[in-house]
Every structure is written in structure tokens, then in C-alpha cells.
Amino acid sequence: MKVLSIIEPWATLIASKQKYIETLSWKTSYRGELYIHASKKHIKDKDTKIQELLKLLPSTEMNYGKIICKCQLVDCIYMDEKFINEIKQNQQEYMCGDYQIGRYAWILENTELINPKIDETGKLNIWNFEISK
């Protein structure tokens, strides 16, 4: 299965369907099923923006080091001024990403939680994970 590691709280925002676009500095041609892994990296939760993001979640419990959901990666869009201005119309989505000209918007749909969550060490880029049988 294809997996993308994302720092918390952004991974849990995707899993809880509060965020549908992941903003990255690199593009991908991959389309299809993508699992979201919450990386082990901890951020400073005293940051004002992080505090606002945490208010969107039903719980402040983070999922560090776990594969937590699956979704469909349906598009990867180069961010230009027009695209960014359109996203600004959705204040919550805009607040949840890093929208700058030259970055990429990975469009995610059909997000589903997985149960149980899978403990795993993350990796950079899209990576493969095989479930032990």
C-alpha cells in the first residue's frame, strides 16, 4: 500500500475530514489509494496557528507514529495565484495548509479511518508498506 507521512495535527485533520488538501513543495504523478501516516515529529503546540487547528479536532489526542486513515489521491495541482484565491474562499481549508505560489495541492477524497491504527516508522515521499499476514 502507498503511504504518505504527515506531521500532526495535519494528519489527524485529514483523518477527521477537516482537511481535504495536503499542501507540499513537490508534485506526484501517483493517483489512487493513499494511506496517511502521522509522523512522530512533535510540533510546538503553543503556536497560535496550531491552537486554532486543534480546535477543529474532536480530541487533542495525536496519533504519532501510526497509519491512521486511507483516502484517494485524485489530483495534484500546481498552486498559482488564481488557485490560491479560490482556496481562500474556504477559510478552514486555507487555514489548514501552506498555500504559496509554486507549491502543490494534493486533492484527497473518500477519507476513511482504519481500525486498528498501524504503528509504523514513517518515511519521506510516498512509501510502500506491506501488511504482515
Task: Kindly give the residue locations of the regions a language model identified.
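Structured alpha/beta reader/binder surfaces that contact nucleic acids or chromatin modification marks
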Residues: M1-K133
